[in-house]
Amino acid sequence: MAKRIIYNENARRALEKGIDILAESVAVTLGPKGRNVVLEKKFGSPQIINDGVTIAKEIELEDHIENTGVALIRQAASKTNDAAGDGTTTATVLAHAMVKAGLRNVAAGANAITLKKGIDKASDFLVGKIKDMAKPIADSNAIAQVGTISAGNDEEVGKMIADAMDKVGKEGVISLEEGKSMETELEVTEGMRFDKGYISPYFATDTERMEAVLDEPYILLTDKKIGLVQDLVPVLEQIARTGKPLLIIAEDIEKEALATLVVNRLRGVLNVAAVKAPGFGDRRKAMLEDMAVLTNGQLITEDAGLKLENAKLEMLGTARRITINKDTTTIVAEGNEAAVGARCEQIKKQMDETDSTYDKEKLQERLAKLAGGVAVVKVGAATETEMKDKKLRLEDAINATKAAVEEGIVPGGGTTLAHLAPALEEWANGNLSGEELIGANIVAAALTAPLMRIAENAGANGAVVAENVKSRSNNEGYNAANGDYVDMLAAGIVDPAKVTRSGLQNAASIAGMVLTTECIVADLPEKKDAAPAGGGMGGGDFDY
């Protein structure tokens, strides 16, 4: 296919145009008074959301070159979402501000490579500063504050997540389900999560989120490799008659058997998913036995004289719901408290008997997985559109609280970054020179962008608010919800340090890439042939 090649300033300007479009669409959602964005869907009702990364994923432009700019800045949002699970809008606004200022300097003749070096050095300096400013999470009240801010100032959500973390521990599993009522409820049930995702992406039932969700499935647990589909046929036939989904957890599933399962899944014959068993050797077998106890099933192993081809329906485990993504599998079970309790006691005895620290650690991990359970948040809403929006906000809030537990909290509302701007300028003036210094100053100028946008979305003058905040002490910032200047930590307006750090690093990385672009190679749009003229109608010509 023929290509279109664009050089120098024209290339950078085309990227900038795409970046402007995406940044503006996402930035309107920032802050407590941020607005919603409506996503039109080809099928089904439109979606009304407030989540930066979801909006970014939806934007595709007609112009290929501008679309490249969109894709670049979308990456800043996606990477932040992958690392911290929140802060995607902040990352987009920061990247946009850095790119705009950087392109002005490149157009004026600055060397893009040296500018990028300055941007990278400034980013490293700021990461260290954020680490120093972070305060560890002290109690569940602080967790509730993080959840509240991340869910768009919804205190009920913040409290519920703090509750859930109290019940299942800070490392515990919190899973989201669509509820049946108008109220959002919390329930703690038996269950576990392990770090293995689906073997093939074709098992995903929700292609938008790339997740496989199985309701009331059967679970086949085996410690052998499944090579031939013939081994599975008897059990698959029994399950097909029940009409229920099936999850297979095995050491591995080889190509032929996997292909057969995928084909059956795609044709709708059987709703099936397959996952590799976690762990290695004896530890793998022990974890499979834990799952068998949890799901009230049997581990099909030749050590116990059981073969796959002879497996019966009653040997399979059951669960209320299983959610699988590319990296993890979450099992939500219920009704086996006694068996799970007995199994936990057995693991505790093994811990007492072993002298190896490594074995103790691994047994402790198994115990935590089995005893911790799963907190299920059932999302309630009046309409499906509201449900989807609430679910995205809750997901952000859960990710933000986990990030806060990991790396601590910093003052929120764009305050931390705004206060770091003078410190960065001072450090850069003392340690950098020439165009590297200009690069660092580009970052310093961009640091107030999130705060300015939060203020503008609340109807205030962003530049005035930013200057006012910079002149105050470190913890003081602008509360956009009511227009006051307050101590952010005392007011409970906090962000996880990890979210602020990830957003900044990814924004600096993307800005550096855009500034050092000198040429774009893209597909030429195909010329569509004009439709042939129709024959004239009898009785004279018509104007159309």
From Swiss-Prot:
Keywords recorded for this protein, A-Z: ATP-binding, Chaperone, Cytoplasm, Isomerase, Nucleotide-binding
Compartments where located: Cytoplasm
PROSITE patterns referenced in this protein's UniProt entry, alphabetically: CHAPERONINS_CPN60
Catalytic activity, as annotated: ATP + H2O + a folded polypeptide = ADP + phosphate + an unfolded polypeptide
Leader peptide range in chain numbering: none
A UniProt-annotated Pfam family: Cpn60_TCP1
Any single biological process term in GO: protein refolding
One function term, GO molecular function aspect: ATP-dependent protein folding chaperone
Stored InterPro entries: Chaperonin_Cpn60_CS, Cpn60/GroEL, Cpn60/GroEL/TCP-1, GroEL-like_apical_dom_sf, GROEL-like_equatorial_sf, TCP-1-like_intermed_sf
Annotated EC: 5.6.1.7
Keyword ATP-binding recorded: yes
Main location: cytoplasm
Record: residues binding ATP: T29, L30, G31, P32, D86, G87, T88, T89, T90, G413, N479, A480, A481, D495
Cellular-component GO terms for this entry: cytoplasm
Family indicated by similarity: Belongs to the chaperonin (HSP60) family.
Function, in words: Together with its co-chaperonin GroES, plays an essential role in assisting protein folding. The GroEL-GroES system forms a nano-cage that allows encapsulation of the non-native substrate proteins and provides a physical environment optimized to promote and accelerate protein folding.
Listed HAMAP family: CH60
Assembly and binders: Forms a cylinder of 14 subunits composed of two heptameric rings stacked back-to-back. Interacts with the co-chaperonin GroES.
Name of the protein described by the UniProt record: Chaperonin GroEL 1
Gene that produces this protein: groEL1
